[in-house]
Amino acid sequence: METLTVKKVNEVYMTIDCDGGSCFELSDYFTFTVPGMQFMPAVRNKFWDGKIRLFNAQTKKIYSGLLPHVQKFCDERDYKLEIDPAYADEEFSLSEAGRFTNTLDLPFEIRDYQLDAFAHAIKKKRALMLSPTASGKSLIIYLLAAYLNKKTLIVVPTISLVQQMAGDFKSYGYQGDPHMITAGVEKETDNPITVSTWQSIHKMPKKWFEQFDVVIGDEAHLFKSKSLTSIMTKLIGTPYRYGFTGTLDGTLTHRLVLEGLFGSVEKVTTTDELIKKGITELPCIGDGRQSGTSGSPSILNASPESATGGGLAWLKTGDTIVIDLNNY
């Protein structure tokens, strides 16, 4: 039986010790074609083949977050995998999570799935949390930041979400104001919590990112792949890495890249389960300007302009529609 050995390089990459044959297999296994690549100038001009290779057969490096996929690769081929002890889970139980949250003066009771997600994230140290609209993911983010109590960078896609996240933290009991970075705002701070748009920091030097022990990406599916990769690969010393997204459909970054940069997907809950539990903030049709985490969550966003003359043109305010959650 062939043995592959995983060794930690830093918080971004690991190496896989393999021979020529298995290295070729790994390279093929972790190679995918970028959707729409045939329309890209680099491909049309034959500067690039339109494929992304997550395993570098020369350096034998791959994103650390893809370790479970490497394990699956080995299981499918009856290869033995030896894993660096540095990737062992932390000891953190659900009861410990509950005891910690009881010490917080929160304005409402934590839902069971929020506690489960919090415990899972601390135990694994990295995860891509699939958390739909109205599931209260900003509270999970707050719990992570409060428990870890380390220099934390929270990255969001829009200015409105920077302000909303900071406001949510205040409402949960955070003392002081998180440092909010948008275009033109000072990026240096002693504040333990920094909330920024990815557009404001993706060109910052690697040295600037060395200060952070925790990185959390909210609405991760909306980040442009090149910018997200630029940010996350500069955080080579950041051990706690969490991505939050409401969907993995239509992401601007390939799912395997998201998992590689953050960690394995963990389903927090589903919209169907939220409604069955009687969550009052029921989904609605939005006008395309909602953040997706507001008090009036939308299961479908459609701008008035795009709806004019289209399939939604016959809908008017107050109309009732039926959504089949089995197909959502």
Q: Can you say where each PLM-predicted feature lies in the sequence?
A:
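Interdomain "pre-motor" coupling segment immediately N-terminal to P-loop NTPase/helicase cores
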Residues: V34-F92
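Conserved pre-motif I regulatory segment
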Residues: D84-L130
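Walker A/P-loop
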Residues: K123-L148
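Conserved helix-turn-beta segment of the N-terminal RecA-like "Helicase ATP-binding" lobe
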Residues: S160-G184
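Conserved helix/coil segment N-terminal to the catalytic DExD/H
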Residues: A183-V214, S225-S230
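Post-DEXD/H (motif II) to motif III coupling segment of the RecA-like Helicase ATP-binding lobe
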Residues: H221-G278
